[in-house]
Amino acid sequence: MSETYTVRSFKGKSPVIPKSCTVFENCSIYGNVILGENCVIMPGTVIRAESGSVIIGENTNIQDMCCIHTDTYEGADVIIGSNVTVGHRALLHACTVEDGALIGMGAIVLNGAKVEKCAMVSAGALVTQNSVIPEGKLAVGVPAKVRRDVNSAELKDMDDTIEEYTQLASDYFEK
């Protein structure tokens, strides 16, 4: 794990980062953030939890330059399940992303929105406030609209991405 990232407590709440996680350089993790085992947090990511919590499940990868943030009112948490991929430069704000989902590069998921299990949000999509992307569906566009089911090849690619980022993190920090 890199030693050049920032971890900061906020109002007595400190991030919890298991030793099995890999956090790259130039990441900032503030407040009530709890990472699950074997998470990979790529360079430049900011995770902030001042009012609520950010909880990230195991084996989840958060790619370069993502922003994950609670809102300013109590209970405006970010919950990200296990085996989730959050693509480069995605923004997650006070939302829920369930197990096995994929958030594409540059996508935005706003307050109260929910991306259900094994759903896929395409690159650049905007999941608007309080909307739901149902389990196993692909959503695209601004605003994001469900287009179809996620197919078996895409589900396999989503699983492969988890394995690839875990291996990538390991390769970077080989001794």
Language-model-derived ranges and their functions:
Residues 12, 16-61, 65-72:
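A positional/architectural concept
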Residues 1-12, 50, 58, 64-67, ...:
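Glycine-rich hexapeptide-repeat left-handed beta-helix
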Residues 85:
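Short proline/glycine- and basic residue-enriched helix-capping loop/turn segments at helix->loop/beta transitions
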